Amino acid sequence: MNAPFRLGKPTVREAGPGDRAAYARFLEGQLQASVFHDPRWLDAVSRGGGHACRLLLAEQAGVIVAALPLHAVSSLLFGRALVSTGFAVGGGIVGDDEAAPALVAAAQDLAGRLKSPTVELRGGILPDAPGWHVKQDSHAGFVMPLAADDAAQLQAVPRKQRAELRKGLAHAFEIRTGNGPQDRAWHYRVYSESVRNLGTPVFPRRLFARVLDAFGNDADILTVLHEGQPLASVLSLYHRGAVMPYWGGGVHAARALRANDVMYYALMNHARERGMDRFDFGRSKVDSGAYHFKRNWGFVPEPLSYAHWTADGQAPRDVNPLSPRYQARIRLWQKLPLPVANLVGPFIARGLA
């Protein structure tokens, strides 16, 4: 955002525990602030993922004018990185454009002190400084207004996808929403199997728990059950009028019954009942299966801009699951028994923040 003219350059410092309230107030006035800038998200990732939060504040005359939240990610497999923000699809610098250069310089300095060779910014004000690389063609976001009622929401789905959805709605599914122990157990059971089937290690169970605990009524789980068994489940975040189905998936049996389609349709209706007016389908890699799935639902992709900096002589970390170097490991992971994948996976997935 453009700020009023101010005398003097901003100063940057690292926030302490006493800055939380001021930072939260600052975010309230920032239209571009995402749920991943929220101090509740920052705390949940630190407590649930084990990555310390380093929040940089730019101030003028003692007033916060811009901020850059970072998580210090460290992994034996994937190396070190300062990420804005951990386990998120958004983040980056928020606030006054003129303060961005000072925050960028401070982030690079912090990376040097932490011996972290890489800084990753997932959105926000993009750096214009030597050594930074901006990508605007690798990921896309998907946001669409919610319809006025359930019937209109069904009609808003393109014809071909609507036919698939109707097949799912013909089954006797039970839809459950909440954030209690049973909801959490169903979600982890379904989600862990879903990502194993994709060849990806599951995140630590405590990460989901910390996010749900931190966000309270601004997060919940919706689960689709068939004959008492959970087939599809999604953990969603609610932020400024939008619902974001963030961690969702389905077991193998969900596909034939179209339980995933029913899950997203049910979430659209549930979110509207909660007062939301937009459905934020999150990001997907361009031309991936998820990318085309969202387009089939009528969502229009919007390019996302990410930036990264790597110290001289260092290689950027590679956590892209589509990278050729990981394809053999992905095929191997898909064959693991689920208990083994769930035991080992969280130790690996911590580094994928």
Segments predicted by a language model, with ranges:
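Short, flexible turn/loop "capping" segments at secondary-structure junctions
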Residues: 4-6, 83-87, 166-170
